[in-house]
Amino acid sequence: MFAHWKASLGFAVLLMIAGDASAQSPHVYTLSGDVAFTHDPSITKDGKTWYVFATGKTPEGGQFAIRCSDDLEHWKRCGQVFDAIPDWIQKRSPGTKDLWAPDVSYENHEYRMYYAYSLFGKNTSGIALGVNKTLDPTSPDFKWVDKGLVLESKAEDNFNAIDPNFIRDHKGQDWLVFGSFWDGIKMRRLDKSTGLLSSTDTTLYSLARRAQPPDAAPAPPGLPPNWEAIEAPFIVFHGGYYYLFTSWDLCCRGLKSTYKTVVGRAKVVTGPYVDETGKPLLEGGGTPLLVANSRWLGPGGESIWMGPKDEDLIVFHAYDAKTGRPSMQLSTIDWTGDWPHAGLEP
């Protein structure tokens, strides 16, 4: 999610707020405490405590800052995942300085974190797995153990193995969805016991991609073309459908960030996914969910918590239109009309 370009959209489009279509406004939390510089937040819960994991290097020199809260509003720093980038990643991807896009879930009596490594603008990337018995940093059992490589992409591949998201379908099968630029969002089946790739189903499923405009500009030297900008996939199951959330356009450029979050849905986890108008996501479809307002730019890098009684949450980052600084934001999801609606802080 760190690396991404795109030709600018018209500013008027960026000022749309997709949640306006909802008959019942979602609740947008007013956050305080340590919420700045929280890229690609992944939210989960252990006991009564909420935890958010974020991309990148920590002030202490480690990787993946952890923030925690008891009420979803007041947040503090409560540790980091790794003290340093694992040696095997440094050997496999020399020059890697940050680890990206953590995705944390609780499966098979352990917390699993899928995460990515890469270099800016390249698809020589990989997705790895770390596990922990607890998220409580005060517990004697607290220790993140790196399980190594899950999936990688090479320069000759048409996909980019970053931005992982774990999903267990309603039949109990585990999947890993991922992708950034190139040919878009992909999916592989996982082995349920190990969390690694399935050896019985090696299919690389295609879920979503951007459509090439007729006036597309040539790709910058050594970089993918701007029109390919789709990444940060996240899938949830709701009301008989799988909903695929992705981030489009430009991330991580402060006041020039043009990220926005879009969504489509399918009856089967492997697709085909369509947007609210029926346009396939493999043909560039996507219904806007989060787009900029006058105060916050580039909302994206989302993760979702599906709670009891439809108490569902979406967490993401956005950029302060005054300072260009990124910050974490949090909204409930309103499912009016069987499509999600969420909001930004005013």
Model-derived features with residue positions:
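Bacterial N-terminal signal peptides that target proteins for export
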Residues: 1-9
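Compositionally biased, low-complexity segments
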Residues: 4, 18-21
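Bacterial N-terminal signal peptides
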Residues: 8-18
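Carbohydrate-active catalytic/glycan-binding domains of CAZyme proteins
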Residues: 23-346
